[in-house]
Amino acid sequence: MNLKNILFGNGDKNTEGGTERLVPVKEIYGGVIALKNGKFVTVSEVLPLNFYLKSELEQKNIISGFAAFLKTAPDELQIIVETRPADISAFCERLESYYNSEKNTNCRQMIFEDAQLVNFIAETEGLSRRFYIVLPYTGQAYEISEVAAEIGETALTARQYLEACGLETVRHSNEDEFLINLLRNYFRPFSASSEAPDTALPEALTPDSADCTGSGYICIEGEYRSYLYISGGGYPTTVGLAWGAPFVEAGDGINISFVLKKESRDKILPKIGNTAMFNRSRLKDVGDTRQDFEQLDDAVESGLYMKSQINREGEDFYYLSTVITVTADSPENLKKREKDILNLCGANGFSCRKAYYMQDKAFLSALPLLQTDTDIFNKSKRNILTSSAAALFPFSSFEMCDERGIFYGLNLHNSSPVIIDHYDTSRYSNGNMAVFGMSGAGKTFFLLLLAMRLRMQGVRVYIIAPEKGFEYRNACEAIGGRFVSIGAGSSDCINLMEIRRNTLDIDSEMQGDRDNSSVLLDKIQSIHIFFDLLYPAITPDEKYLLDRAILNCYKAFGITRDNRSLTDKSGKLKKMPCFADLIPFMEKFTELKAVTMALKRLVEGSASGLGGQTNIDLKAPFIVLDTSRLSKEFTALGTFIATEFVRDRISVSRVNKKAVILDEAWKIAGENGNEQAADFVINLIKTVRGYGAIFVSATQNVVDYFALNDGKFGDALLGNSRLKLLLQLEETEAVKLQEKLMLTESETTEVIRAGRGEGLLCAGRNRIAVEIRSSDTEFDLITTDRESLAKRVKTE
């Protein structure tokens, strides 16, 4: 007699031809799985949502919607969470289309290398999560064809309720193939294929080999698996919304099975009442100093609470069972992953136990077949009400992997690729981004990397660089961009007075001109902001006279408030005045002498690059406007001219995607910044979305960022930037952002200790640690590292 076998069951080593007992599937037909025990189930794949991207109200609505689903769902259901290597095939297909249409050699090379890089991450590090709901057939039919017709109604109802709470269910072109491939991952992990099997079920699912003799793991076709469960008393007393999220993000090789079993109210209420009464009677006999007094008191209160919620609030009573599958390629790696999941459970208040001598039973319980073993279920079941069951909501993922986005790098939480689609308005209320990072953290590197990848996807990019603009030149010119240097000694010039459009109607190219607002008056507002920067002491009287001088200057060129005066008979825009043309009109007013002298420095003096006619082609798809060569007193002026030009360019149409990148935004909004110029930038940030554009700002001086007007500029910019990237920061600056973004202590510490090129990516309440990744060609074009540059010079 073997005592171990009597106590724990007999684990048999299955050899070829003896592994069929592991497969409880009899047949698959019409999207239905027929089991050998006579039961039927159907499986629906559910696409997750970024729960923490939602507002608090949206989160509550999602949980309420999921509770409504549970109310209408069958009494028993299973939720499966699988971790798999990331599937980035759709993203790579898009890169291929960009590669085929790209003419610039360097861009083609970078697109090719990016595709290789993303594919490498997906194969070696990248993970994705798949979510499934398993529903049983509860009707009376016995034939699978009849079952398929009836269970389809159940699946349709479930789909409608899930969609009502924001979840989308996947509709596969061939449901039977989907189910076969899903099950192959469990039974034949290294034989999974998208093709239909050559043999009939269940032979097609039967593993070639399986070893179930181990007390702590089984081995299916060389894949080692161990099974753990959350013990019935191992759950926290109170849980928050989406409390199942930590399990979802557990990491590589971790799958989760949640089984919910609803109990009849008529059956469960008497049990709850009797148990509460029994515990109350025991409480009378227990002194309040005994160790178990509080446990009994809590049990009484819990029983009364559950009874009240069921009777008065209409909640249902469920048993929840959670089984965790850990997979690895060796017993050593399996043990390491087991330790990780045990630590994760402990850190989140859960008590996790290993299913020793029950691994084969746990294996069957974890299959997406709703076949939980009775022993496993009794050891792991926990009673919960509808509200707590709905709050489980495991269909939440920290992944940021948009199919049509820009590749950022690696998600350090779960090793998935980070791909962000700034233009997806269904996911992000706006695609604007604020980037923070101390000197040397990789801020400029990231900005250029983002800009080049946007350019490679057909986005028109404008970069404004008030500091160290030369760092952008090499990459800009290598991809066919236009580098514009605005400053002393430069021949490049942009005329602020130039009017570049004949209507303010952004939709005029599609629906005709319906907006008669004066383009001239709109331009004059910008000119006045420029003079506020140029001559901060200007008085209201001087502003009035300046206004007259500007109007008279435009009138001399045949331009009035009437938009029709902007073009000649051929329909082309007329020649526009510049500051050199404005000076004679200003000199007619002696009261403007001081203002005129300030302007003359831009026309005749050392800063003449700011006052002449536009002499460069500004229609390139990638433009860098470098104002860093200007002296400190003119930096804000040059940056404003560049920003005003960009606003002009992006507001012509909203058909094409555009991106505006402003580095060192504190130059405009810092302590010595100009409030009107800051308001101009804020207005641009607020309106770019309507132009089909995004605005990306960056700074290494967080304190200065919030210095102007008690932080008005910084707050407005953060409030209108759905995405934030926090690279490494000094402690004082990280603490400042902690207040503004409500970061936790651990998140703040993470930002302070981040390595170069690492940071915290925030999208709403969803925050992930990310490592920026570039290809070799991108790195060579972007890097400002002295040693890397020296190596390149030596090589050349």
Enumerate the language-model features and the residues they cover:
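P-loop NTPase motor domains
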Residues: N2, L22, V32-I33, S44-N50, ...
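Extended, folded cores of ATP/NTP-driven motor/assembly subunits in large transport
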Residues: N2-S397
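Hydrophobic positions on the alpha1 helix immediately C-terminal to the Walker A/P-loop
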Residues: F446
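Post-Walker A helix-loop "phosphate-sensing" segment adjacent to the P-loop in P-loop NTPases
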Residues: Q160, M452-Y462, G481
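P-loop NTPase motor core of the ASCE superfamily
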Residues: D114, N119-A122, S128, T157-Q160, ...
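Walker A (P-loop) phosphate-binding loop of P-loop NTPases
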Residues: G440
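Conserved lysine of the Walker
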Residues: K443
